Amino acid sequence: MKNKSKYREMSYKELVSKRNDLKQKYMDLRFQAVVGHLDNPLEKRSMRREIAMLNTFIRQKELAGEGAN
């Protein structure tokens, strides 16, 4: 994935804000799917996986002591 190296270089706060943005976009996609107007159904899956990857990097930063709790 092309974003892995980019995510590794991001700070904890940047990762959290990116995750929150993607979660909001994912919710919008879910609502569009319910209404029935979704252009690319695979976009939901890829976004969900990207959120999971961000969660992994956030957790790694927390364990390394870089996260602000």
Swiss-Prot record:
<dbReference type="InterPro" id="IPR036049">
    <property type="entry name" value="Ribosomal_uL29_sf"/>
</dbReference>
<dbReference type="InterPro" id="IPR001854">
    <property type="entry name" value="Ribosomal_uL29"/>
</dbReference>
<keyword id="KW-0687">Ribonucleoprotein</keyword>
<dbReference type="GO" id="GO:0006412">
    <property type="term" value="P:translation"/>
</dbReference>
<dbReference type="GO" id="GO:0003735">
    <property type="term" value="F:structural constituent of ribosome"/>
</dbReference>
<comment type="similarity">
    <text>Belongs to the universal ribosomal protein uL29 family.</text>
</comment>
<protein>
    <recommendedName>
        <fullName>Large ribosomal subunit protein uL29</fullName>
    </recommendedName>
</protein>
<dbReference type="Pfam" id="PF00831">
    <property type="entry name" value="Ribosomal_L29"/>
</dbReference>
<dbReference type="GO" id="GO:0005840">
    <property type="term" value="C:ribosome"/>
</dbReference>
<keyword id="KW-0689">Ribosomal protein</keyword>
<dbReference type="GO" id="GO:1990904">
    <property type="term" value="C:ribonucleoprotein complex"/>
</dbReference>
